[in-house]
């Protein structure tokens, strides 16, 4: 079964590609399914075939992972066996996003002071996401429901969470008063996540460093709690020896982390891939993925610096979310390319949102840049969701599984 057949089913028929795996769809459900599903399946038959052969490979462990394993094992033991791993992941992501949106609501320019409970909620939301994200794979193995879809879903949620986590951190330390630093921190976060999967696309193995996601998440949780304890005076206070504001300390940590991580990533990338003649796992150039993330960052910098109305300075959260959704989509496409051993194509609807902003500036802001930013934000979010829903549904249909439900017997079982 290639996954192509079920996209032609009539509304009301049994629909194996339904995101939640329900058998019967109402008229409203059918309309939503068409709205959030691409007209043609995103993956070819050859890609689906190679996806079946994919096996998850990882190497290394971070500093806190051995210490957290006991807690994670205890936590997964409390989860009912009928709860699907992907459901655990999406619940954690939803909580993480909702708590960050609270901060965005109260601090749209990342310079305001939010209610103390909003910072506590954001810290708790991130801890919940970190916990649930860590146990989804354990739940998959525990219920014998591991699949390539689970791995893709996990990385896809992480790509979106990264955007909200770095944005929430910038808001917590009120980094909007230093727009250049805020811009750097947010894009450095998404760039590092992309590079992690870039080196996986090259080497075939996802590598974890001594300081990795878990450590960064714990550090960010501490930042939110410090915002509760110290408030604005704490972040505005000066660090004695360095003679800089305290709020720049997380930014300097981001610089150090970016240098450290990217050094390791590019060492793997430039060493050569596992493909023919040192190419990627798909047999393509090891440098080819740079075109995608490079295009996103270049457009983001140009639009930021050329704006006549200080678009980023006045609306940093909307700006970061817009380009964050674009980055999340191309990261997801990179993960799919790795798992299906296929080439990444540069032409993508993800670039339409940034292109609208660029063209509007080129024609001397024929339309208010703020309005175009909202259009780009909505389009980029819709484009991301549409792609993710389509890919997940097609893979679920092909593997004869459900996205958010565990089947009694699982036909395909890989490492999650």
From Swiss-Prot:
It catalyses: CDP-ethanolamine + a 1,2-diacyl-sn-glycerol = a 1,2-diacyl-sn-glycero-3-phosphoethanolamine + CMP + H(+); CDP-choline + a 1,2-diacyl-sn-glycerol = a 1,2-diacyl-sn-glycero-3-phosphocholine + CMP + H(+); 1-O-alkyl-2-acyl-sn-glycerol + CDP-choline = a 1-O-alkyl-2-acyl-sn-glycero-3-phosphocholine + CMP + H(+); a 1-O-(1Z-alkenyl)-2-acyl-sn-glycerol + CDP-choline = a 1-O-(1Z-alkenyl)-2-acyl-sn-glycero-3-phosphocholine + CMP + H(+). The keyword Lipid biosynthesis applies. Pfam families: CDP-OH_P_transf. GO terms for molecular function: 1-alkenyl-2-acylglycerol choline phosphotransferase activity; diacylglycerol cholinephosphotransferase activity; ethanolaminephosphotransferase activity; metal ion binding; phosphotransferase activity, for other substituted phosphate groups. Residues 1-20 are annotated as: Disordered. Disulfide bonds: none annotated. GO terms for biological process: phosphatidylcholine biosynthetic process; phosphatidylethanolamine biosynthetic process. Its main location: endoplasmic reticulum. The chain crosses the membrane at residues 89-108, 116-133, 156-176, 180-199, 210-230, 246-267, 286-306, 315-334, 349-363, 368-388. Its EC number is 2.7.8.1, 2.7.8.2, 2.7.8.22. The record marks 151 as: Increases basicity of active site His. The modification Phosphothreonine is found at residue 40. GO terms for cellular component: endoplasmic reticulum membrane; Golgi apparatus; nuclear membrane. CDP-choline binds at residues 86, 151. The modification Phosphoserine is found at residue 18. It is an enzyme of class 2 (transferase). Mg(2+) 2 binds at residues 133, 154, 158. Belongs to the CDP-alcohol phosphatidyltransferase class-I family. Catalyzes both phosphatidylcholine and phosphatidylethanolamine biosynthesis from CDP-choline and CDP-ethanolamine, respectively. Involved in protein-dependent process of phospholipid transport to distribute phosphatidyl choline to the lumenal surface. Has a higher cholinephosphotransferase activity than ethanolaminephosphotransferase activity. This is Choline/ethanolaminephosphotransferase 1.
């Amino acid at each position: 079964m290639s996954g192509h057949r079920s996209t032609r089913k009539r509304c009301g028929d049994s629909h194996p590609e339904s995101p939640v795996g329900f058998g019967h769809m109402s008229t409203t459900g059918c309309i939503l399914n068409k709205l959030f599903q691409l007209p043609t399946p995103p993956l070819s038959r050859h890609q689906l075939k190679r996806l079946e052969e994919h096996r998850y490979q990882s190497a290394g462990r971070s500093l806190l992972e051995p210490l957290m394993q006991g807690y994670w094992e205890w936590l997964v033991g409390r989860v009912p066996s009928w709860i699907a791993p992907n459901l655990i992941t999406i619940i954690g992501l939803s909580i993480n996003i909702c708590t960050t949106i609270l901060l965005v609501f109260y601090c749209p320019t990342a310079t305001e002071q939010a209610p103390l409970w909003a910072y506590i909620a954001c810290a708790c939301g991130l801890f919940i996401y970190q916990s649930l994200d860590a146990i989804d794979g354990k739940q998959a193995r525990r219920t014998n429901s591991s699949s390539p879809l689970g791995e893709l879903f996990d990385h896809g949620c992480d790509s979106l969470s990264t955007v909200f986590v770095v944005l929430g951190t910038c808001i917590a330390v009120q980094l909007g008063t230093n727009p250049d630093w805020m811009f750097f921190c947010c894009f450095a976060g998404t760039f590092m996540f992309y590079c992690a999967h870039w080196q996986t696309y090259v080497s075939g193995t996802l590598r974890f460093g001594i300081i990795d996601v878990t450590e960064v998440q714990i550090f960010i949780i501490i930042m939110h709690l410090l915002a509760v304890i110290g408030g604005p005076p704490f972040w505005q206070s000066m660090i004695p020896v360095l003679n800089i504001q305290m709020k720049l300390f997380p930014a300097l940590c981001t610089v150090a982390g970016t240098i450290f991580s990217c050094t390791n990533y590019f060492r793997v990338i430039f060493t050569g891939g596992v493909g023919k003649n040192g190419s990627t796992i798909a047999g393509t150039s090891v440098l080819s993925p740079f075109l995608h993330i490079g295009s996103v960052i270049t457009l983001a910098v140009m639009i930021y610096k050329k704006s006549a109305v200080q678009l980023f300075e006045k609306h940093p959260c909307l700006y970061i979310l817009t380009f964050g959704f674009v980055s999340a989509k191309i990261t997801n496409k990179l993960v799919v390319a790795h798992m299906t051993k296929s080439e990444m194509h540069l032409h993508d609807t993800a670039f339409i949102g940034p292109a609208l902003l660029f063209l509007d500036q080129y024609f001397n802001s024929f339309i208010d840049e703020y309005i175009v930013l909202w259009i780009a934000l909505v389009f980029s979010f819709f484009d991301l969701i549409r792609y993710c829903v389509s890919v997940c549904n097609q893979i679920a249909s092909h593997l004869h599984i459900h996205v958010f439900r565990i089947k009694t017997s699982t036909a395909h079982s890989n490492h999650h």
